[in-house]
From Swiss-Prot:
InterPro entries: Haem_export_protD_CcmD, Heme_exporter_D. The gene is ccmD. Required for the export of heme to the periplasm for the biogenesis of c-type cytochromes. The chain crosses the membrane at residues 19-39. One of its GO terms (cellular component) is plasma membrane. Pfam families: CcmD (PF04995). Keywords: Cell inner membrane, Cell membrane, Cytochrome c-type biogenesis, Membrane, Transmembrane, Transmembrane helix, Transport. PANTHER family: HEME EXPORTER PROTEIN D. This is Heme exporter protein D. GO terms for biological process: cytochrome c biosynthetic process; cytochrome complex assembly; heme transport. Its main location: membrane.
Length: 58
């Protein structure tokens, strides 16, 4: 499938809003799937460090 111009490419034969929003939502979900475990690990390590400091003080 070839397009006459970049504008035609973005419009995708009048399906552009659906196509680009689907790509955007997919990328958002992928980013969340990558970021969430990293953030959860960071929170877990911070909580464990806090717990170990409390136990060391007792």
């Amino acid at each position: 499938m070839s397009f006459e111009s970049f504008g035609d490419f973005l419009a995708m034969g009048h399906h552009g809003p659906y196509v680009w929003s689907a790509y955007g939502i997919s990328l958002l979900v992928l980013a969340i799937n990558v970021a969430e475990p990293l953030l959860a690990r960071r929170r877990y390590l911070q909580e464990e460090a806090r717990r170990l400091r409390r136990e060391a003080q007792q």
